[in-house]
């Protein structure tokens, strides 16, 4: 039997601890911006299920609804699973070195003396003691109100089993085999459970809508769907029953049929004296702890022991007939999930369908033999930890797509090959320490990944057989154009290693390829350009005569005097200067500029038109 502590003393100590760490509790879900020893690092409040149960019973004295405290759990206590339940039946009597008769006499003598003293003292201190008890009770209630107020605002808590923690006196055996509600933490976003059966926590339907981080360590999970699907549906729809992993025999007349895996083997019970039962139309028979147990067999029929109500049986059977479909809000905010050392052997498909926002997943310390195919249901997954399992290969990545995966931890497994990792182009960091990889050539599978930065690979057989494995791996990545030197076991290439490194492959030069013009798509443009070309005017300069003019000739061959176009100053420079007629024409234009001024163009035009008419008359004659 462990040590105990007075309940009121525990309440005072807890209130003092919370009051001195209020700010650090408020920052519990977040990381501290710096790691200075002077900064207030975030702290999570740690409780045991035993102490939480005691506090909830005290909160009920305030008239606060803390949730049901009578949800029984079948087969909770096992040899491999710890709990706060304390039994005095198997304790062997201690050997005493003195006679029992003498001890009894001494106890009787001391008892008589103490009774006489207490009777005399009670005469003088009856009234003052009653007043002090009243004041003490009021102080305890005020402290409880403060603790309850803090519980409703706490963003993170940790339920950790610790056998060395003193139990509350007169509550040593509680919570027995009942589930403890956690709905009093209304602002909870981070929950950590260590060493407890997850069925001992009630309120998973509420937790699935608020949690952003869930840590389950050493919780002995039979299946991951038990916490992500089963308990959420059980707490939301059955409410008064608790699932059990035990397989129950079918009734002789029942016919076997299939059921949904999320609702298999349900067995829960509720006390007949509970508030939930008293609300129904049937009065309780006895106010005892769990006098009726509802058993759901595999065929979906409900059989009762001790007079279970038909209403509960009907609701239970209706749940068995429904599909395991969670609401859209269930686990929609969960970003980090850790289920480490929970004895998981496999991950069923469709178990992660509701975790569309999950960024980090930790399944280390389990008994997985392959990378689960269900990981393909996590589109936002960036970090995956599968350390300390029994995984032999990575070929699952050929069948699933994890486009955002950046960190992969596969240390302490049985890997013999890295086949499949070439299908994870976003991978940046890889940890494969303490595996069974014998050939360094396996790292060529990662060469084409330009995002890859760091690898941890110590304690593999090839690190002993290949003395220069680091240089070999560095050169593998240098062969690929555009790649960079990676880090191996936290270190880049050393000074001596750089002497044996090959030159980096240069990136190929960019070749700008001109795509041929699509004639079909650009046919209208070609047509329009041809029409413009037909309508354009051709400039003709007659340089045979000294008094020549520039006129235009349309495409049809007709000469029109209205379409005469004169050359400007820049165009006049294009006239060949080595001919005598060209020089004469230039001098003529310069003389017109000096005499006519800005109107020299009009004068030249009139002169050229007149000369052209006279020439036509002479030709006609």
From Swiss-Prot:
Modified residues (Phosphoserine): 269, 271, 274, 290, 292
PROSITE patterns named in the record: LRR
Keywords: Cytoplasm, Leucine-rich repeat, Membrane, Nucleus, Phosphoprotein, Repeat, Vacuole
A cellular component annotation (GO) from this entry: cytosol
Stretches forming LRR repeats: 333-354, 357-379, 380-401, 404-425, 426-447, 451-472
Location in the cell: Cytoplasm; Nucleus; Vacuole membrane
Chain segments carrying region Disordered: 552-581
Name assigned to this protein: Uncharacterized leucine-rich repeat-containing protein C926.06c
Source organism (scientific name): Schizosaccharomyces pombe (strain 972 / ATCC 24843) (Fission yeast)
């Amino acid at each position: 039997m462990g040590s105990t502590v007075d309940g009121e003393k525990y309440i005072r100590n807890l209130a003092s601890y919370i009051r001195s760490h209020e700010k650090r509790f408020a920052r519990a879900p977040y990381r501290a911006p710096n790691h200075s020893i002077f900064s207030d690092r975030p702290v999570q409040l740690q409780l045991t299920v035993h102490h939480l149960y005691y506090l909830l019973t005290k909160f009920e004295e305030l008239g606060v609804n803390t949730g049901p405290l009578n949800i029984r759990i079948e087969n909770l206590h096992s040899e491999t699973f710890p709990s706060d339940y304390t039994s005095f039946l198997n304790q062997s009597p201690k050997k005493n070195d003195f006679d029992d008769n003498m001890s009894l006499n001494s106890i009787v003598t001391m008892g008589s003396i103490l009774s006489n003293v207490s009777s005399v003292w009670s005469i003088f201190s009856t009234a003052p003691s009653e007043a002090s008890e009243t004041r003490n009770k009021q102080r305890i209630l005020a402290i409880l109100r403060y603790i309850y107020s803090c519980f409703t605002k706490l963003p993170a808590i940790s339920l950790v089993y610790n056998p060395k923690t003193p139990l509350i006196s007169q509550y040593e055996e509680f919570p027995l085999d009942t589930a403890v509600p956690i709905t009093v933490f209304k602002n909870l976003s981070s929950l950590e459970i260590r060493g407890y059966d997850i069925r001992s926590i009630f309120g998973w339907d509420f937790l699935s809508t608020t949690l952003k981080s869930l840590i389950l360590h050493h919780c002995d999970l039979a299946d991951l769907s038990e916490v992500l699907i089963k308990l959420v549906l059980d707490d939301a729809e059955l409410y008064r029953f608790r699932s059990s992993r035990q397989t129950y025999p079918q009734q002789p007349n029942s016919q076997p049929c299939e059921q949904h895996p999320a609702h298999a083997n349900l067995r829960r019970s509720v006390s007949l004296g509970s508030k939930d039962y008293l609300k129904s139309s049937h009065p309780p028979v006895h106010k005892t702890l769990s006098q009726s147990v509802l058993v759901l067999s595999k065929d979906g029929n409900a059989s009762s022991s001790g007079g279970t109500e038909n209403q509960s049986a009907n609701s239970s059977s209706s749940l068995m007939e429904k599909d395991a479909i969670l609401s859209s809000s269930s686990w929609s905010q969960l970003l980090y999930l850790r289920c480490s050392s929970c004895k998981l052997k496999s991950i069923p498909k469709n178990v992660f369908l509701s975790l569309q926002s999950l960024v980090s997943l930790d399944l280390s310390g389990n008994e997985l033999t392959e990378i689960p195919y269900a990981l393909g249901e996590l589109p936002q997954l960036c970090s995956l930890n599968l350390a300390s399992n029994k995984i032999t290969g990575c070929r699952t990545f050929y069948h699933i797509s994890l486009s955002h995966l950046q960190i992969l931890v596969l240390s302490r497994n049985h890997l013999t090959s890295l086949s499949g990792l070439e299908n994870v182009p976003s991978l940046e960091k890889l940890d494969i320490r303490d595996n069974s990889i014998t050939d360094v050539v396996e790292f060529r599978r990662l060469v084409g990944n330009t995002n890859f930065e760091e690898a941890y690979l110590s304690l593999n057989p090839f690190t002993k057989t290949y003395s220069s494995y680091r240089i070999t791996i560095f050169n593998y990545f240098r062969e690929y154009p555009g790649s960079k030197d990676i880090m191996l076991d936290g270190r880049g290439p050393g000074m001596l290693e750089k002497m044996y490194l090959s030159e980096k492959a240069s990136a190929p030069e960019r070749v700008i390829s001109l795509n041929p013009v699509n004639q079909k798509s650009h046919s209208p443009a070609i047509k329009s350009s041809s029409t413009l070309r037909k309508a354009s005017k051709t400039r003709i300069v007659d340089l045979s005569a000294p008094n020549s003019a520039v006129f235009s000739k349309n495409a049809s061959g007709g000469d029109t005097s209205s379409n005469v176009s004169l050359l400007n100053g820049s165009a006049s420079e294009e006239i060949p200067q080595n001919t005598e007629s060209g020089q004469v024409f230039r001098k003529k234009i310069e003389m017109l500029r000096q005499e006519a001024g800005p109107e020299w163009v009009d004068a030249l035009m009139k002169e050229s038109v007149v000369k052209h008419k006279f020439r036509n008359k002479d030709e006609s004659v």
